[in-house]
Amino acid sequence: RTLLALHQPGNPVILPTVWDAWSARLAVDAGFAALTVGSHPVADSVGKPDGEGMSFDDLLARVAQITAAVDVPISVDVESGYALSGDQIVDGLLGVGAVGLNIEDTVHSEGKRLRTSAEHAELVGALRRAADASGVHVVVNARTDLFLRQDGDESDRVDRAIARLTEAAGAGADVL
């Protein structure tokens, strides 16, 4: 619950992005109370492309090195979930000491299509149920990529993004 407690309305938490034990130690030494492992820098650091260019197991290996090096809560960008179940994602993250995750609605393994709102909420719900079943409050951050894409009409993009994130919150996301 430490990571969740850092998320306070009106007082946003700043999570610096780290990619290895060295960058994590630098961030903690600078005074940050929690960290996030970014998909792009961690993939770049091992010569792989962002967008699930490295496997989930490879990501977990890097996260394990980071959590072994620092004693602060770690959240991990799991991109679109590597086509895994909520249980597999949560079990993997908890197994290496992470207590938060970021899940996006672009499905990299399926031609970078955008999940429907219902699909994204279903995945968020599966992640929440898996976390709750573990007994650890994993902080679930749901993200939409609507503003990074040219999907749909520009005139209602903000409304569609709000609707997508509202549905994700209803499914159990802690952070949007």
Where are these regions (language model features)?
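Alpha/beta enzyme core
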Residues: 1-176
